[in-house]
Amino acid sequence: MPYVNVHGVNLYYEEYGKGPAVILTPGGRVDRNGLRPMAALLSPKCRVILHDRRNCGRSDVVIGGELSEQHLWAEEMAGLLVQIGAAPAYAAGGSAGSRTSLTLAVRHPEVVKGVFIWEVSGGPRSGELMAPGYYGQYIEAAERGGMAAVAETEFFAQRMQDNPSNRERLLSMDVQKFCTVMRRWSATFAAPNPVGDLTEAQLKTITCPVVLFAGNTPDEVHHVSAAENVLRLVPHAEMRPSAWTHAEWDVIGQHDHTFPGIAATNRYSMKATVYAAELLAFIDRVEGSESAQAHATVTQAVGVK
C-alpha cells in the first residue's frame, strides 16, 4: 500500500491518471472513498491524488503538534505533494476539505495552482456546533475510561481496523496529553473565524485562483456566509451557484430534517458529475492562461511582434 512519511506521520494515498495534478480532500474526518466517483471522472484528464489525512482512514493516528489539526492537515498535504512530485497541484474538496484546501493555499502557495471548493464550512455557529463531534466526545471518553475508552469509540475503533499500527500509538498515549491537545484543537476549531480556522487576514493572502460554490439554507455548519466571506476576502475568487436546488437540499442537506443516513460523503458522490465538470473547466482555463503567458514571455524575449 502506498504511504509517504511527512514529519513523522505516515499518510496513505492513491493516485490515478496523468495530467495536471489534483488532490481531493473529503469532509469531516472521513476517508478518501467518498471522493472516488469524482476521482474516476477526473482521471482521464488529470493526475488525481486521493489521500487520508492524519487521524483519518488508513493514515496514522497522531494526536500532537503545535498547530491546529486543520493547519497540520495542510502542512502534511504540502509535504505529500512535494514528496510524490505532484506540486504545484489543484486542491479541491468539500467542508473540511474546503477549509484544508484554503489553508494549504495560505501556508504553502508554492504548491497550489488553484483551489476548488464546495460546502465551505464556517459561519456564526459552525465551529461551536462541530467541536463536540470532532473533539469533545473523545475528551469525555478519555476522562471517563482512559485511552481504552477512546479506543472503543466507533471512530477510533475504525482507525485501528483500517491501520493496525494505530492501536499501539493510541493506547500508549498519556491521557492528560491527549486531553490537552484535543482541548487546544477544540478551542481553535470553535473560534469565530470567517472560514474554519482561518482569519480574514490569512484569507486575504491567498494569491491563486479560487472557484467555490455558494452555500445552502438551512445549514449552520456550512453557513452561506462562509462562501460569501471567501468571495469577499480572497482576491481571485469566483462563486458558482450551489450544486443543489432548494428542493433537493430540503431532503438531502445538512440540517435537522435530513433524510436518514445521508452524510456528506453521500452528497459529494451524488454531485460528482457537476463538481468534476466545473473543476475540469477551471483547470483548462488556468492551464490555458499559463500557456498564453509563457508564449507571450518567449515572444517578448526574442523580440517578435
Across the structure, where does each feature detected by a protein language model lie?
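Flexible "cap/lid" loop of the alpha/beta hydrolase fold
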Residues: R99-R107, K113-E143
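Catalytic active-site module of serine/aspartate enzymes centered on a nucleophile-bearing elbow/loop
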Residues: H236-K305
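Conserved HGGG/HGGXW glycine-rich cap/lid loop of the alpha/beta-hydrolase fold
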Residues: N5-V61
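Short beta-strand/loop motif that positions the catalytic acidic residue
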Residues: I206, L212-A214
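Active-site loop/oxyanion-hole signature of alpha/beta-hydrolase fold enzymes
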Residues: L50-A92, T258-V274
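Catalytic nucleophile loop
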Residues: G93, G97-S98
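Hydrophobic, aromatic-rich cap/lid helix
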Residues: L171-A201
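Conserved alpha/beta-hydrolase "acid-adjacent" motif
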Residues: D219-A226
